[in-house]
A protein has these predicted regions:
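Sec-dependent signal peptide recognition
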Residues: 1-8
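N-terminal signal peptide c-region/cleavage motif recognized by signal peptidases
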Residues: 12-16
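Extracytoplasmic cell-surface/polysaccharide-interacting catalytic and binding patches
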Residues: 17-94, 98-249
Length: 249
């Protein structure tokens, strides 16, 4: 009888969902679906990906969503024409498939998964897999390694904060974010400058949960149309009744 009760308790007990990371490693998934603070994302369809011209990237070829490419090229052109940037912005890391993310995340298995997740999102939990996110680099680097906090002090990074939202880009992980993800001033995602921009609705749907629960900073502010009420029409005033003159008899 006791064995039956124990078995029943085990069946009815709530199971803890886990994300499979590396071989023999897993991570508990929180109630809101996050693993080590990161939200889940799927792979971008290959048919929707294009390669950024090589002159705008460093290292491996940069692959992004086709809908995002025009705004990214306009951003690079604007930065290149602004002397305040004092350098050149380049794409460092763009779309990464879940399989590629797994190889990146698991290559440092000497440390714990929790420690690695501070700087690298677990496979299946990276914005890079969507094709809408990228890491920027500055050239010349002037002693600041790529993907390090020192980038925030560069003129190019300051230019990004002031101007990137005009091109539909927002900083996913600002300092002190409630998502408890490492501050990444180099990491930006595209959601379109307006909801009517081509492909923006799809991108905003992909990031809808992140944008609602953990707002970007700077973020792309949604357009709010305000209508001013027309001035009230004057109330017509009835003319005073005319006094009829009495006729003399």
């Amino acid at each position: 009888m006791l064995h039956r009760i124990v078995a029943l308790v085990l069946v009815l007990a709530p199971t803890v969902a886990e994300a499979q990371l590396c071989e023999g490693q897993s991570a508990a998934i929180s109630a809101d679906g996050r693993a080590f603070g990161h939200l889940p994302y799927g792979d971008a369809p290959e048919s929707e990906l294009v390669t950024l011209p090589s002159e705008y990237s460093v290292g491996n070829p940069c692959v992004v969503r086709a809908d995002m490419l025009p705004d990214l090229l306009r951003l690079f052109a604007a930065a290149q024409g602004d002397p305040s940037v004092m350098g050149q912005l380049r794409a460092l890391s763009c779309q990464r498939s879940i399989a590629r993310q797994r190889s990146v995340f698991c290559r440092g298995e000497t440390s714990s998964a929790a420690d690695r997740a501070i700087s690298v999102a677990p496979p299946g939990y990276s914005e890079h897999s969507t094709g809408y996110a990228l890491d920027f680099a500055v050239r010349p680097a002037n002693g600041c390694p790529d993907a390090e906090a020192c980038m925030a002090a560069t003129p190019a990074a300051r230019w990004l904060r002031l101007n990137a939202p005009r091109f539909g880009f927002e900083q996913s992980f600002p300092g002190g974010n409630k998502q408890h993800v490492k501050w990444e001033p180099w990491h930006w995602r595209w959601v379109g400058a307006s909801g009517s921009a081509r492909g923006a609705a799809k991108a905003r749907f992909v990031f809808s949960r992140a944008r609602r629960l953990y707002p970007a900073d700077p973020g792309v502010v949604p357009l709010v149309v305000k209508f001013s009420a027309p001035p009230p029409l004057p109330t017509p005033v009835a003319p005073p009744p005319s006094r009829s003159k009495k006729k003399r008899r």
